[in-house]
Amino acid sequence: MCVKGIKTETNNILIDTGMGSADLTSNIIVTPNANKLLKNLKRIGVSPRDIDIVLLSNLQKDTVGGATRMDRSGRTIPVFPRAKYIVQKSCYDEIEQGNALRISQLYDKEEVINLHKSGQLELIDGDVEILKGINAIKTGGYSPGNQVFFINSGTEKYIFLGSLIPTPLHLVDNAIPSYAYSLNDAWTAKKEIIKHGLDQGALLIFGRAREKQSGYITEKYGKLSVDFREL
């Protein structure tokens, strides 16, 4: 999984906390190891206290695992002490009310609850403009409150796909992650996001790809292809 970052005039923002870091004012930096997140932030002159916002696609382990850590007393505390962690309310509702087996397999319930207790987890409902040019779009499907992020940076448009279309291989019409909460909703949302990407000429960023993590999509004779680009 890869983490993306955005640096605006007033905010340092991360998208998911699995691995990597980025600065959209220059380029996007991708690293393959979750343990390197803080080191890569340090490399670009950013400390954990400098992070203002963490956008979370959902609350599953591979998305939110880097959001908290144990302190010396054994308490779970946020890694980014000043940040707002933003996620859909229906994602948190699933943690509290969802199928127990699914929760145990895909979530670290205690970690998420402790993050909520810290007061730093902000629950939103539906499509929300986080900041000018940065929008959270609720898709559902993969999880009840799964969200993707539309980012406008000058003339460039980006879509961070997170878990909805995790790799380029999942652009294929019937390729939906088998552990999606609703296969039908995930398929519908996927089609809508792909259409938006085509219409807007947006750069798609695949949130779980280890290689070839971003590119522009084109459609010819009903078939999609990706013009991969380095970030």
Walk through the language-model features, giving the residues of each.
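Conserved beta-strand hairpin/beta-sheet module of binuclear metal-dependent hydrolase folds
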Residues: M1-K39, R43-I44, V148-S163
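Short, basic/aromatic-enriched C-terminal tail that caps enzymatic domains
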Residues: Q213-L231
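Active-site metal-binding motif and surrounding structural segment of the metallo-beta-lactamase
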Residues: T31-I86
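Short acidic/His/Gly/Ser-rich catalytic and metal-binding motifs that mark active-site loops
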Residues: I15, A22-T25, E94-E96, T167-L171
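Metallo-beta-lactamase
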Residues: G20-S21, I29, N35-V46, V79-K138, D185-G201, ...
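Divalent metal-coordination and catalytic microenvironments
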Residues: I6, D16, I51, N58, ...
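Active-site glycine- and acidic-residue-rich loops that bind
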Residues: V64-T68, I137-Q147
